Amino acid sequence: SIKPQRTLNLMNSAEKLAWEDELWNEFSASKYEESLTDNTVVYPVVGIVGQIRAGLGGFTKLKGDTAAQDAYIASLRENDTNWYNLLFRNAFSQGHHLSLSGGSDKSTYYVALGVNDEDGMLIHNSYRRYNVNSKMTLKPVDWVRIDIGMEAARQESRMPYSSVDPFNYAYFSNPYEKAYNDDGSYAADNTWFTLGYYNGRGVEQVMPKNGFSLLRELDSNYSSTKNTNGTFRTQVDLKILEPLHFVGLASYSFANNSTDKVVDKDTYTAFRDRLGSDDRSQTNLYGSISQNRTDRNSYVVRGHFAFNKTFGELHTVNVLAGAEVRGSDANTIFTKRYNYDPKTGTTSLPSVSGPQDEWVRQVEKLNGEYFSKTRYASFYASADYYLGKTIVLNASFRTDGSSNFGSNRQFNPTWSAGAAWHLGEEEWIMKALPKLSHATLRAAYGFTGDVNTSTSHLLVMQYLQQQYRYFGDETFNLGTIPSAPNPDLGWEKTQDAKVGLDLGLWKDRLTVNTEYYYRLSTDVVTSSPVQSTTGFTYVYFNAADIMNNGVEVTVNGKLLQKKDWTVSAAVNFAYNFNKVLKYKPVSQSGITSKDRYVEGYPTGAIFSGKYSGIASDTGLYQFRLRPDAQIATATDLNKPDNYRYFLGTTIAPYTGGFNLSASWKQLKISVSGMFSLGSKTYEKMRYPASYSNTSHSGVSTETVQSQFSDLYGNHLNVEKDRTNRWTPSHTTGVKYPRVYDYYDARYNFSSYNPMDYSIIDAVYLKNNSYVRIKSIILTYSLPSEAVKKLRMRGLSFNISMNNFFTFTGYDGMDPEIPGATYPTTRSVSGGINVEF
C-alpha cells in the first residue's frame, strides 16, 4: 500500500509564517503594545509568530528586538517538514497459502493453511495472522453422512500509541516545526499544545520539560494485541427413510483476546495520564501498562427434518421443519498499573498526591470487569413445490426468541412466500422467442425481524466506585442509570415485497437481472431524550417506521468471443428511495439538525441553511430566509427556524459497480469499479485549535460564526487560500469570511445574523458523488504444455493496482470517506498461484 500524499493544498512554512505575521499585525500588535503598560489588556497569541513577537516561552530573549525576531522567523522558513513522509510509509504485506485435499468414496478431507504478514502504513505498525481450516466428510454407510470441520486462527498486532492522533497531526501540524534537533534528539513541537497555554490557560496546561514530540510518542509507546479464535462443528445427515432426512448441527466457537498498552514515562501521553495532583507536576513522572483480557464463547445447536419426494414426473415436494438454539457469553477483565518496568514486569503505585479520597477513587477505577450473556431460540419450517421445470412455489415460517426483550415481546413470528416461473422452460415461449436462452419471472413477499443489540429493556445501573450513601448502620454503593428501562421494547420488523425478471439472450452472451423491491421497516428502535423530572436522560423504544423501495439491474455481456480473444463487461445499477413514514419521539420541539429521523423525509436527511454568499458589509456568511419566515425585530434574523431548508441526504440514492475483462491467450486484464451518485456530506474537519482552547475570564466575547472566522483556528496549519478573505478593504469576490477575535466584543453579530451551527454548517456541504476504479488486475497463466513439464496442474502470476483513479467534483481528500485527514489507501500487490 502506498502512503497518502498531502493533496489538500496546505500552506508551506514560508506561507504559514507570513500568514501568522499578517494576523499578528492586524489583531495583536497594537494590543500587545498597550499591554506593556496596562496588564488588563488581552491580546491574541496565534502561531509561533505570535509567541516570538510577544517574547513568550523560549523566546523571552527576543522580546522587544524586532530585528532578531525577524531573523529567527526567517530561519524557520528553512524548515518545511512533511509530516506525512515522517509518520507514514509504504505498507508491505505478504500472504502464503497452502491447501490439500483428497479421499475416497467413504471419506474426503480438505486442509488449508495460511500465513499473512503485514507492515502497516503507520510507522512501527505490524500485523501477523496464522490460520488453519480443515474439513472431513465421512460416509460409513449409505444412510449416514458426517461432516466435521475446524477453523482456528491467531492474530498478533503491534501499533504505536499516542494520545494525539497521528493522522490529524500530519494534516494540521505546522510545517515549520522540526522533527529532530541538530544533535539528533527529538525536537519539541512549539505550537501543537501552546494555544491555550499562551491565551489564558497557562496554569491549567502545564507541559513536560521535554515538550511534546509525536515521534517520541510513536517510538516509545505501543499497544500489542493477541487474538486466538476457533470454531468446531459437526453435522450429521441421516436418511431415516428414502424421502425423509434428519440433519443435525452442533457448533462451538471461542475467542480469547489480550491487549497490552505500554506508555513510557518520558512521553506526553504518560504526562497527561497521572494520578491525583501529579498532572500539574513536571517532575513526578511515571509510565503505565494497561491490560485487557476478553474471553468469548458461543454455541449453536440446530436440527431439522427434511422431506423430499417426487410424485409422478411433474410434482416434487420439499418440506423442512426444525429448531435452533444459540447463545454467547463474554467476560472482560481490565487493569492498569503504574511505574511499569518492561524489563522486569514490576509495577508500583505512585505516592498519594492531592486529596486522599479523590486519589483512592482514581485508583479503584484502574481495575474492573464486564460480562454479557445472550440467548436465542428459533423454530422454523419451509415448503417448496416444483411443477416440472417451470413453476416453483415456496413458503417459510419461523419464530425467534431473544433475551434482549421483555418477556411479553421475546418471540417474533415471521413468514415469507414466493413463486418463480421459468419462462425459458416453456416450449411455446422458446419457439416465439428463439433468441432467448433463459428467462425467469419471480416474486416474493414476507416478514423478517431484527434485534438492535445496542439497546436493552432492562434497568441497567452503572456503579460509581468509592462513592457511597450511608443510612443508619448500612452502606449503599451509589450508581447511575443512563437510560430508562422499557419492558415493552421489542423486535424491529421488516415487511419485504420483491418482483424480478432474469433473462439471457443469444446463448447467454447477454444476461439481464432486474428486481424491484418494497421494504417497510416498522418498530425501528430509536433513543429519545426525556424530561429530566423522570430521573432519566433518554429511553430506547420502538418509535419509527421507514419505507425503502427501489430497483436493481445487473447486465452481463460477452462482447467478443474468438479463438484467442475474449472481452466481457458487467454493470450493476441500483436506485433506492427511502422515507420516514412515522417517528414519534417522547418529546419533540421541531426539526433540528440532530434529528436522526424526520417524518416525511429520507433517513440521513440534511436540514441546514441555503448559503447565499458573504455579506459585503459585515464579512459574515449569509443565508436565504424561508418564505414563511416571520421577521418582526432584528433579533428574528438570528433564529435558525427562519433559515432551515431540506438540502438532500447523506445516503446516495444511486449506487452501483462495473467490471470490464479482456483476455488474449494466457494474458488477462480486469478492471472493476464502483460509483455513488446523489449524496451530500459536510466537509467539516474538526480543527484541533479554536477559541474553545483559550480562556480569558471576565472578558466580553463575540460569537464566532464558523471556524473560518475563528482567529485562533489559524494557530495550526490551514489551506493556502485562507488568505483570500473578507477585509474592510477587500469586501467582494472573496472565498472566506472575515476573521475576528472571539475576545474582541464590539460587533454584536449574534443579534442580527444566523449563528446556530446547524444553519452555518451549510457552508461545508459538498456533493460527494464519485466514480472510482477500485482495481486493475493483470494475470498471466503459463500454457498447459509448460505446466505439465513442471509437473504442476497450473501456474499463474498476477499484479493488481487498487484505488488509483477517482473521478469526482468533490474537492476534499476522499469522497468515499468525506472529512477524512487520511484517504482510502492506494496499493499495488502481486501474487503467484501454484496448483499441484
Report the location of each language-model feature.
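Membrane-proximal, glycine/serine-rich, low-complexity loop/turn segments characteristic
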Residues: 1-230, 235-237, 306, 316-317, ...
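C-terminal beta-signal and adjacent terminal beta-strands/loops
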Residues: 4-8, 86-87, 434, 661-759, ...
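Conserved small-residue
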Residues: 1-74, 333-341, 541, 558-650, ...
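Extracellular/periplasmic, surface-exposed regions of secreted and cell-surface proteins
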Residues: 63, 129-130, 135-144, 149-154, ...
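Short Gly/Pro-enriched turn/cap motifs at secondary-structure boundaries
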Residues: 87-91, 371-372, 488-490, 648-649
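Short Pro/Gly-enriched beta-strand edge/turn motifs at strand-loop
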Residues: 76-83, 365, 639-642
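Aromatic- and acidic-residue-enriched carbohydrate-binding clefts of CAZyme catalytic domains
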Residues: 272-284
